Amino acid sequence: MGNIHIQTKSKEYDVYVGKESLSHLTTIVQNMQPSVSNIMIISDEAVASLHLQTVVDALQIDRKVFSFVVPSGEKEKSFENFYAAHTSALENKLDRNSLIVALGGGMIGDLAGFVAASFMRGIRFVQVPTTLLAHDSAVGGKVAINHPLGKNMIGAFHQPEAVVYHTPFLQSLPEKEWRSGYAEVIKHALIGDVKLYHWLKEDVQTLADLRDEKLIHILTKAIPVKANIVAQDETEKGVRAHLNFGHTLGHALEKELGYGNITHGDGVAVGMLFAIFLSEQVYKVNLAYEEMKQWFLKYGYPKMPSDLSVERLVQLMKQDKKANAGTIHMVLMQEYGVVNVVSIPDETVHIALEAFQKDMF
């Protein structure tokens, strides 16, 4: 098992990674001061049916424990479910000393975290991720819900008390979710750990390799990349934006295709390829785009759909949180491990995106 210490200006906490990590949950709760009054577990239907009772049983503590379960899917990260969770919290008499446990993937972590951030102006919560993708979202304190006009547009910064990454929970994931989460692993390697990038190319030949000791190795290497960036910039005023590598186009694809019709990781994978494609032009460097494209396709990442309107995607990219005064800002790569936020004119993005779309076919 590997423990990772997270340090930010507002809070310090640990990420417990391994096959026995759930055994830490009771101790974490018992050691909290002031003492936890009661516990609300927020999960989704798919995860709850598999793991909710396991977590309840692991909480060997004399406190009221109740659950709030929403349907599965990114579209459920909505104001309606956010409001309903608050109603459930009030009906079950949560107070300022209560604890919320986020049991699920990134959608649940974001929703539950935002409920914790806003209920009575902020109560404590613990992340219990059940997907590979959540190795990114569970760490760093960004919590949010979606708006019909944009992803993660309503939210806060609210750090968890701990992250309990019990790797056996991941074994029930379908392949598309392994692929989705692996995209964020690749992102962390490309922007912050070149040695990990080369290790992935050598040691992860198929998604089936993302198991057991290799999985723990990946998590204990990828999470510190994010931790180091968050330690420098907790509230995304500077270098934390580097973690959005691949996300400008990725989020636009999610919005255009409809949440649930493309996974977050698949969108980010296409977005990273485009960022590398554009970076070669902007920086006049060779980043081995063709080799990278073949590597991504080997894992089953999608190509950019040929029937999507480039103009529509450009307009959606202008709604990205990094955009400033209607100008697209993208995270581009100077070299492996070195990225920057760059202002890109609409016309440049449009021309590059058209060329990229054609190159995919």
UniProtKB/Swiss-Prot annotation:
It catalyses: 7-phospho-2-dehydro-3-deoxy-D-arabino-heptonate = 3-dehydroquinate + phosphate. GO terms for biological process: amino acid biosynthetic process; aromatic amino acid family biosynthetic process; chorismate biosynthetic process. One of its GO terms (cellular component) is cytoplasm. Binds 1 divalent metal cation per subunit. Can use either Co(2+) or Zn(2+). InterPro entries: Dehydroquinate_synthase (IPR050071), DHQ_synth_AroB (IPR016037), DHQ_synth_fam (IPR030963), DHQS/DOIS_N (IPR030960), DHQS_C (IPR056179). Its EC number is 4.2.3.4. GO terms for molecular function: 3-dehydroquinate synthase activity; metal ion binding; nucleotide binding. Keywords: Amino-acid biosynthesis, Aromatic amino acid biosynthesis, Cobalt, Cytoplasm, Lyase, Metal-binding, NAD, Nucleotide-binding, Zinc. NAD(+) binds at S72, G73, E74, K75, E76, K77, T130, T131, K142, K151. Its cofactor is Co(2+); Zn(2+); NAD(+). Zn(2+) binds at E184, H247, H264. It is found in: Cytoplasm. It is an enzyme of class 4 (lyase). Pfam families: DHQ_synthase (PF01761), DHQS_C (PF24621). Pathway: Metabolic intermediate biosynthesis; chorismate biosynthesis; chorismate from D-erythrose 4-phosphate and phosphoenolpyruvate: step 2/7. NCBIfam families: aroB. Catalyzes the conversion of 3-deoxy-D-arabino-heptulosonate 7-phosphate (DAHP) to dehydroquinate (DHQ). Belongs to the sugar phosphate cyclases superfamily. Dehydroquinate synthase family. This is 3-dehydroquinate synthase. The gene is aroB.
